[in-house]
Structure formats: structure tokens, C-alpha cells
Swiss-Prot record:
Belongs to the XseA family. This is Exodeoxyribonuclease 7 large subunit. It comes from Neisseria meningitidis serogroup C / serotype 2a (strain ATCC 700532 / DSM 15464 / FAM18). One of its GO terms (biological process) is DNA catabolic process. It is found in: Cytoplasm. Pfam families: Exonuc_VII_L, tRNA_anti_2. Gene3D superfamilies: 2.40.50.1010. Its EC number is 3.1.11.6. Keywords: Cytoplasm, Exonuclease, Hydrolase, Nuclease.
């Protein structure tokens, strides 16, 4: 008999399971293109439809989780490309695709072009961190490249007005989607770069489908951002949207509003830093004044009797006073210049800065006067102490008619009983000195005095 009658017999369920295994193991990773027909959306959120072309069709099921990722709902007649698990529904033996991903027909070629351009730019170093330009801390002007009708423009302008209303904004209008929009976006970026009116440039638009954002993946836009001499912040779409413009820009912001926050200084933070600078200036000036006062007190306590030491101390105090005055003036000028620079940077808040400026002027006026008064007082005190020392000095006593008598060894003679006849003496007067000899002997003669 034929082998046909002796071959293994499969049940229907075994056949379907075998076919399912073959399909799932050998047809993975395929994209299938076709037109949506017989579309049904269940209350559960699942999609059931057929994908057809001119000669055949296949049943498809797309469950709620995958359907939630669609940029927009499916509709009858859509030309799409799907990827998923190709299998057999064993219960009914029906061939079907369980869809995991959907894209509009033709996006496959776009993604291929996207990956090619991305790889090329990567190889050229367009994404390298070292070519990124830093953002200015306090821009004098901010540029925006977007559509005048875009909600993103309103969001950016509102944020800039709230955070830094004193900074002017220039808009370089351009369509941000549609045929030819990539060329117009690129031209707007080139215009901003050539005019050099702004310190930083925001390139932005609101969220949308991948097709809506595709202009920012086109090479003209990417090359324009790469060549721009002004730092560029990209704020395209939502936080989960990534375009080639994001990779080549100097900074990527998650949203247009985020881009506005990145480029604008915070007004409250600036005012806080100004208040801190004023406090530090006051503390430094007070500390220098106290240090100078203590040093003058210490110098006054170091004054000793010799006239030469007094003269040296006078000269030292004068020099220290000049140095201290010069140092304080220099520091005051430096802090004043810094304060004026910060005042100019915050001209929008001139009333508050004016109060601070008046305080600085008051301190500039009061401090030299106080220092001069203190220095005058110290000089008067020094003069009085010098006069007191002068009054009790030996020279002054001699001028009153006294004299100093010393023996040949330089010992002062305080008692006449120690004198001996013929002893040599040295007498110092106010206006001179002389040597004498004792003519009348008293007591034992000293051998040393007879030489």
C-alpha cells in the first residue's frame, strides 16, 4: 500500500498549532502595507480590521495598549504599514496579524532617510559636545524662529515676559510644517545668524504627529542650525519627541516653554543676588573700618619714650593711614563699579536700585568723614602724650638749672660723701658738659680716680 495511508494523522488543532508555530518563528519583524477596510472599534478600545491590496486581504487585530500609542485614530481607507505577530487564530483556523505598531504608508522610507542622515551627521561630529556653544547668562536680545500662528510662540513670549520683561524679543516667522517648510525654516535661521541681532536663538514649534514634526529632521534645517553663529536652543514638540534638530542644537529643551526658561534669567534670582552683594559690601566696609580702628589703638599703645621712636611711630601711623585710606577708597571704587554694573543690568527695576545707590553714596560720604575725625582724634592724643614725655625728659630738667654729675666710670654721683680729693668728675649741663676735679679731700682716695 502507498505511504500515504501509513503517514501520521494530525488533528485539526494540531495542524493549526503547527502552522501557527511556523508563521510566528519565520515571519517575525516584517512590515506589511495595505489599505484599512472593515474597520471596527470595540467598546474595550480594541481595533479589528482587514488590511487589503488589489489582490488579497488579511485580518488584523490591534489591542487597546497598542491602539493608545496611535498618533491619530484609524479610519476606513487609511493606507498604512503595520508590524506585529503574524499567526493563526487556532480556534477558527483564521490567518491574522496581531498589530503592535502602525505608521502611515511611506514613513518607512522617511525613517531610512532619517537614519542615514543621522549616521552621516554623527560621523561628521555635528552632535559632538565640544562644538556646542554655551548659552549667554544674560542675553541682551532673544530670537525666536517659529510660525506666527503657533501656540508655541504665545507660550514662549508669555514665559519670557514673566521672567525677563526687559529683554527684547525678535521673531523670525516661518511655516513649521507642510511642503517646503524645511527650506523656509532654514532660511529664517540663516537670517538670524547673518543679522546677529540676538545673543541666543530659540527654534521651536508645538507638539504634533511625526509627519508634523518632520521638517525638523530635514537636512536644510539641520545644516542651518549647525552653521548658525548664534547659540541655538531647540524646543520642538513634547518632551518625548526627538528630531535631528534637537541633536545638532547647542541645547535641547523638552518644550518651547522649557526653551524660554533656559535662555532667560530669573528676575527674582537677580534681585536676590543684588541684595546679597549689597550685604557683602556693607559687611566688608564695616569690618575694614573696625580692623583699622583696632590697629590704630594697638599702634598708640606701642609708643615709647625716646623721641626717635615717637617720630618713627608718627611716620608709620601717617603711612598706615594713607595706605588704609587708599585701600578703602580702592575697595569702595571696585564695589561701587560692580554695583553700578549690576544696576545697569537691572534697569527695569531702577526704583529699587536707586535706593541701593543712594545708600552707597551716603556710605561713601560718611565713611571718609568718620575716618578723618578718628584720625584727627588719634593725632591729638599722640601730640598730648608727646608733650607729656617732653615735660619729664632729662633734657627738660637740665634746662631748669639742674646738672648731672658722673664719675669716670659713668656712675651718677647722688651723694657728696662719696667724693674724694682729686677725683675726676664729668658734669652735664643743659647747654654743654665739662670735666672737673675735686679740690677738697673727703674720705679714702680711690685708686681709679688718681690715674
Amino acid at each position: 500500500m502507498s505511504d500515504f495511508f501509513h503517514s501520521d494523522v494530525l488533528s485539526v488543532s494540531e495542524l493549526n498549532a503547527f502552522a501557527k508555530s511556523i508563521l510566528e518563528n519565520h515571519l517575525a519583524g516584517l512590515w506589511i502595507a495595505g489599505e484599512v477596510s472593515n474597520l471596527t472599534r470595540a467598546a474595550s478600545g480594541h481595533y479589528y480590521f482587514s488590511l487589503k491590496d488589489s489582490r488579497a486581504q488579511v485580518r488584523c487585530a490591534m489591542f487597546k495598549g497598542a491602539a493608545a500609542r496611535l498618533a491619530k485614530p484609524l479610519k476606513e481607507g487609511d493606507h498604512i504599514e503595520v508590524a506585529g505577530k503574524i499567526s493563526i487564530y487556532e480556534t477558527r483556523g483564521e490567518f491574522q496579524i496581531t498589530v503592535n505598531e502602525v505608521r502611515l504608508k511611506g514613513l518607512g522610507q522617511l525613517y531610512e532617510a532619517y537614519e542615514r542622515l543621522k549616521a552621516q551627521l554623527q560621523a561628521e561630529g555635528a552632535f559632538a559636545a565640544e562644538r556646542k556653544k554655551p548659552l549667554p547668562a544674560r542675553p541682551q536680545c532673544i530670537g525666536i524662529v517659529t510660525s506666527l500662528a503657533a501656540a508655541a510662540l504665545r507660550d514662549v513670549v508669555t514665559t519670557l515676559k514673566r521672567r525677563a520683561p526687559e529683554i527684547p524679543v525678535i521673531v523670525y516667522p516661518t511655516p513649521v510644517q507642510g511642503t517646503g517648510s524645511e527650506l523656509q525654516i532654514a532660511q529664517a535661521i540663516k537670517t538670524a545668524s547673518q543679522r546677529a541681532e540676538c545673543d541666543v536663538l530659540i527654534v521651536c514649534r508645538g507638539g504634533g504627529s511625526i509627519e508634523d514634526l518632520w521638517a525638523f529632521n530635514e537636512e536644510p534645517v539641520v545644516r542651518a542650525i549647525e552653521a548658525c553663529t548664534v547659540p541655538v536652543v531647540s524646543g520642538v514638540g513634547h518632551e518625548t519627541d526627538f528630531t535631528l534638530a534637537d541633536f545638532v542644537a547647542d541645547v535641547r529643551a523638552p518644550t518651547p516653554t522649557g526653551a524660554a526658561e533656559l535662555v532667560s534669567p530669573n528676575r527674582q534670582e537677580s534681585l536676590h543676588r543684588l541684595a546679597q552683594a549689597q550685604g557683602r559690601l556693607k559687611t566688608v566696609l564695616e569690618q575694614r573700618y573696625f580692623d583699622a580702628s583696632q590697629k590704630l589703638d594697638w599702634l598708640a599703645r606701642q609708643i615709647r619714650h625716646p623721641r626717635q621712636k615717637l617720630d618713627e611711630q608718627r611716620a608709620s601711623i601717617g603711612k598706615l593711614a594713607q595706605t588704609l585710606s587708599y585701600s578703602m577708597k580702592q575697595n569702595l571704587r571696585a564695589h561701587t563699579a560692580r554695583f553700578e554694573r549690576q544696576t545697569q543690568a537691572l534697569q527695569h527695576y531702577r526704583p529699587d536700585v536707586s535706593v541701593c545707590k543712594n545708600n552707597i553714596v551716603r556710605l561713601q560720604t560718611a565713611l571718609p568723614a568718620a575716618f578723618s575725625q578718628l584720625l584727627t582724634h588719634r593725632r591729638q592724643s599722640l601730640t598730648a602724650q608727646a608733650a607729656l614725655l617732653e615735660a619729664v625728659s632729662p633734657q627738660h630738667i637740665l634746662e631748669r638749672g639742674f646738672s648731672v654729675v658722673k664719675d669716670t666710670r659713668g656712675q651718677v654721683i647722688r651723694n657728696a660723701d662719696v667724693l674724694k680729693q682729686g677725683q675726676k668728675l664729668h658734669i652735664t649741663f643743659a647747654d654743654g658738659e665739662t670735666d672737673v676735679r675735686v679740690s677738697k679731700e673727703q674720705g679714702q682716695q680711690d685708686l681709679f680716680d688718681c690715674i
